[in-house]
Amino acid sequence: MKKYNKIVLTGASGRLGSYLREPLSKISKKLVSTDKIKIGKTLNNEVFKKLKLENFKDVNKILKKTDILVHFGAYSNEGPFQEILESNILGAYNIWKCAEKNKIKRVIFASSIHSVGMYKVNQTIDHKVMQKPDTFYGLSKSFGENIAQMYWDKCGIECLCIRILSCAKVTSKRSLSTWLSYDDLIRIVIQSIKMKKLGFEIIYGVSKNKRSTI
């Protein structure tokens, strides 16, 4: 199995990031996990770096000599615009600008269904529909997709944008329509890293089931 010299994971203390740490550590010689909040015990080949995404200098320092960047760090809900602006919008700019400076060739980005959240609930949509964000949070994820597209077109930085629906335990039949299992999330991320060619792609993060409108 090929092992990458260095993978950087942002948002490592979050619910989704915490599930990705161990799988990412298995395909890397060194996993650098970052977040504002410290993680628990680190894995054998993992180091933790405290990081605020809005701090360009710190982002640039951490991304030096990085092979793959898995960007799951964000203000993860709707909230005050200033907080979303700093973590999600300025943070996304810092991520891609520093990826360019450090010659990182591939980014895996946690986008959200909220980037297209204004479509009707029963309307079937695909990855080609126009963005219709429903919140400032969704707007920030739309920005992340757009800056990823720009850096692919201008600089050749590959990116998979995963529009995650809901990656949590199933609590009802209705919740199956948006459910992404943790195992499927891990498979998406790992396979997108291993792909020989990726380019720029947007996919929906949802597990296969009959109730989904995606």
Which positions does each model-derived feature cover?
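Conserved Rossmann-fold NAD(P)-dependent oxidoreductase catalytic core, especially the SDR/UDP-sugar
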Residues: 94-132
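Flexible, glycine-rich beta-alpha linker
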Residues: 136, 157-177
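Conserved glycine-rich Rossmann-like NAD(P)H-binding loop of the short-chain dehydrogenase/reductase
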Residues: 28-40
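N-terminal Rossmann NAD(P)H-binding glycine-rich loop of SDR-like oxidoreductase domains
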Residues: 5-27
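Catalytic helix-loop patch of NAD(P)-dependent Rossmann-fold dehydrogenases
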Residues: 86, 120-159
